[in-house]
């Protein structure tokens, strides 16, 4: 009986977009890619290379070592590359900037008051955190996270938390510097006349300490983590889904 005939069709209820947990990338990986080499002189793929057959096969008659299927039945499998040093994802630089400006450089808590009576609104018993949390949730309910209104409220929180009145963290008492972005991906923290460069490892450590309940203030939900945008592992797509080129009358997947 073929593999296809045993598959049970399922209906997709929803698709949720978000950041991917590095541990999930490793978990779904069939092989760790450690070399950029593809094929040996004898035509066989290098083990742990970019064409390692554990990520799928494209030649008739060959079996994928991961699922023991031929190319027409095997969907292919992801691999992964473990980075020696973390790298900032350039597509999320603005998110990182917002997170660094809105949180404490020591305890990583949001620079908003948590005590009752600190709300800028009309409720005298409400905290500043509750005030902005309720406003953000209201915007999400009415307009969604992709709306202009959502961007505006997150920018408002960023402006408040990085203002001149937030030079000292209200949670731990640490002095706060000014976050500067030297494009494309270099962050610095300036204190008076001194300036400290934040390397990707520093940034990741800072972001990883932000409490889950404070992520809403930087425009994230608890199912994602900000440190995931500082990459430590890269997914390698299955061989079967990669674009191909013709080289010396042979089809080569890249």
Where are these regions (language model features)?
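Conserved core architecture of multi-subunit DNA-directed RNA polymerases
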Residues: 1-252
């Amino acid at each position: 009986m073929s593999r296809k005939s045993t598959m049970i069709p399922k209906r997709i209820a929803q698709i949720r977009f978000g950041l991917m947990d590095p541990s999930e990338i490793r978990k779904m990986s069939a092989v760790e890619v450690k070399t950029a080499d593809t094929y040996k002189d004898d035509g066989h793929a290098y083990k742990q290379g970019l064409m390692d057959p554990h990520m799928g096969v494209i030649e008739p008659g060959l079996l994928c070592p991961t699922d023991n299927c031929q190319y027409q039945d095997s969907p292919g499998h992801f691999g992964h590359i473990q980075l020696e040093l973390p790298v900032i994802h350039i597509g999320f630089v603005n998110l990182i900037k917002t997170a660094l400006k809105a949180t404490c450089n020591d305890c990583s808590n949001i620079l908003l008051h948590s005590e009752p009576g600190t709300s800028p609104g009309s409720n005298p018993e409400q905290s500043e955190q509750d005030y902005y949390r309720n406003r953000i949730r209201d915007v999400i309910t009415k307009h969604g996270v992709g709306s202009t209104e959502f961007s505006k409220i997150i920018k408002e929180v960023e402006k408040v938390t990085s203002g001149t009145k937030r030079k000292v963290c209200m949670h731990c008492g640490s002095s706060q510097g000014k976050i500067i972005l030297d494009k494309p991906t270099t962050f610095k923290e300036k204190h008076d006349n001194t300036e400290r460069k934040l390397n990707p490892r520093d940034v990741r450590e800072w972001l990883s300490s932000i409490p889950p309940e404070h992520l809403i203030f930087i425009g994230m939900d608890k199912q994602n983590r900000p440190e995931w945008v500082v990459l430590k592992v890269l997914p390698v797509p299955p061989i079967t889904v990669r674009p191909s080129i013709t080289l010396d009358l042979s089809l080569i997947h890249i």
